[in-house]
């Protein structure tokens, strides 16, 4: 598992904000977003979770994340039944990408490996911007999580 660096284009996403301990709130956000997606028959893009807080610095009950999926650039949020849902644009830029499999539910270890070992070894450092997970498989059906962790970066 090594870090690769890519220049990414901006991407539009739609989703829902969750606040609280990640292990509880992110699955709830996934269920809510999936129900909304099915109700509105929105084509399902890449499934992502955007993280806005560091669990080492923010109390669990205040942790913020956005459970989202990518949509077309011209997507318009339905006016009915979309309360609590929002459109965002993930910024274009340089990203470090770390591909991992989580089979034991220990996301904290994987993120720690990324920030404490793999990212520093790459010669890049995080910058203020976006960090998120891109889910690459059907996690519930497979029983594990294949994902890419993305972080905006600059050359160290």
From Swiss-Prot:
GO cellular component: cytoplasm
Any one GO MF annotation of this record: DNA topoisomerase type II (double strand cut, ATP-hydrolyzing) inhibitor activity
SMART domains in the record: AraC_E_bind (SM00871)
Cellular location(s): Cytoplasm
Keywords: Cytoplasm, Stress response
InterPro entries according to UniProt: AraC_E-bd, DNA_gyrase_inhibitor, DNA_gyrase_inhibitor_GyrI, GyrI-like, Reg_factor_effector_dom_sf
Main subcellular localisation: cytoplasm
Protein origin, superkingdom: Bacteria
Keyword check for Nucleotidyltransferase: no
Keyword match Amino-acid biosynthesis: no
Assembly and interaction partners: Interacts with DNA gyrase.
Protein family membership: Belongs to the DNA gyrase inhibitor family.
Functional description taken from the UniProt entry: Inhibits the supercoiling activity of DNA gyrase. Acts by inhibiting DNA gyrase at an early step, prior to (or at the step of) binding of DNA by the gyrase. It protects cells against toxins that target DNA gyrase, by inhibiting activity of these toxins and reducing the formation of lethal double-strand breaks in the cell.
Record-given protein name: DNA gyrase inhibitor
Species whose genome carries this gene: Serratia proteamaculans (strain 568)
Biological classification of the source: Bacteria, Pseudomonadati, Pseudomonadota, Gammaproteobacteria, Enterobacterales
Gene assigned in the entry: sbmC
């Amino acid at each position: 598992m090594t870090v690769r660096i890519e220049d990414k284009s901006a991407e539009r996403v739609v989703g829902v904000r969750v606040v609280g301990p990640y292990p509880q709130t992110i699955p709830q956000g996934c269920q809510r977003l999936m129900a909304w997606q099915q109700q509105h028959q929105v084509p399902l893009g890449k499934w992502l979770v955007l993280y806005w807080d560091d669990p080492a610095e923010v109390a669990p009950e205040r942790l913020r994340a956005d459970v989202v999926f990518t949509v077309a650039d011209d997507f318009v949020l339905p006016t009915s039944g979309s309360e609590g849902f929002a459109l965002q644009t993930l910024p274009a830029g340089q990203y470090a990408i770390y591909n991992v499999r989580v089979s034991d539910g220990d996301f904290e270890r994987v993120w720690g490996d990324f920030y404490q070992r793999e990212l520093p070894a790459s010669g890049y450092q995080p910058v203020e911007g976006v960090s998120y997970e891109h889910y690459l498989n059907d996690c519930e059906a497979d029983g594990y999580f294949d994902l890419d962790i993305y972080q905006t970066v600059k050359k160290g």
